[in-house]
């Protein structure tokens, strides 16, 4: 399970270090794709296969399914970590997430998310204001 918040910068070649605490939970490879709210989602190969199986069951007759799958898969990249644990994202993913220099990497249970620091700060500020209300509306789980 992925968790935690880590701050790293893109290096001068556009590579980002994925923290060892996150890398240690997977093999040497992940799949990265467009995430929600302007971030990048990163999945272990095992988790990616589960997602692919779920997406394969969606009806292609639905326009929104086709749109989502096109964007989700066209932005996806399989990547191995280099010896320093770095990943070099495609220009498409960097543009989607607004990655320029400062990045925040967070663990979110079955995936990691990579955010531009400014976007993460904005999201976190807004979400923190609603945290109690959001939790209250999650009736299905009892924390």
UniProtKB/Swiss-Prot annotation:
Keywords: Cytoplasm, DNA-binding, Repeat, Transcription, Transcription regulation. InterPro entries: MraZ, MraZ_C, MraZ_dom, MraZ_N, MraZ_sf, SpoVT-AbrB_dom, SpoVT-AbrB_sf. One of its GO terms (molecular function) is transcription cis-regulatory region binding. It holds the Pfam family MraZ. GO terms for biological process: negative regulation of DNA-templated transcription initiation. Residues 5-47, 76-119 form the SpoVT-AbrB domain. It is found in: Cytoplasm, Nucleoid. GO terms for cellular component: cytoplasm; nucleoid. Belongs to the MraZ family. PANTHER family: TRANSCRIPTIONAL REGULATOR MRAZ (PTHR34701:SF1). Forms oligomers. This is Transcriptional regulator MraZ. The lineage of its organism: Bacteria, Bacillati, Bacillota, Bacilli, Lactobacillales.
């Amino acid at each position: 399970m992925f968790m935690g918040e880590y701050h790293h910068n893109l290096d001068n070649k556009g590579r980002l270090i994925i923290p060892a605490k996150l890398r240690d939970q997977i093999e040497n490879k992940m799949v990265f794709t467009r995430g929600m709210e302007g971030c990048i989602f990163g999945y272990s190969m095992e988790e990616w296969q589960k997602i692919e199986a779920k997406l394969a069951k969606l009806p292609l007759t639905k326009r929104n399914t086709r749109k989502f799958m096109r964007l989700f898969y066209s932005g996806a990249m399989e990547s191995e970590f280099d010896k320093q644990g770095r990943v070099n994202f495609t220009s498409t993913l960097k543009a989607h997430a607004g990655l320029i220099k400062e990045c925040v990497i967070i663990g979110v249970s079955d995936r990691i998310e990579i955010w531009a620091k400014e976007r993460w700060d904005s999201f976190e500020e807004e979400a923190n204001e609603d945290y109690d209300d959001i939790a209250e509306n999650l009736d299905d789980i009892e924390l």
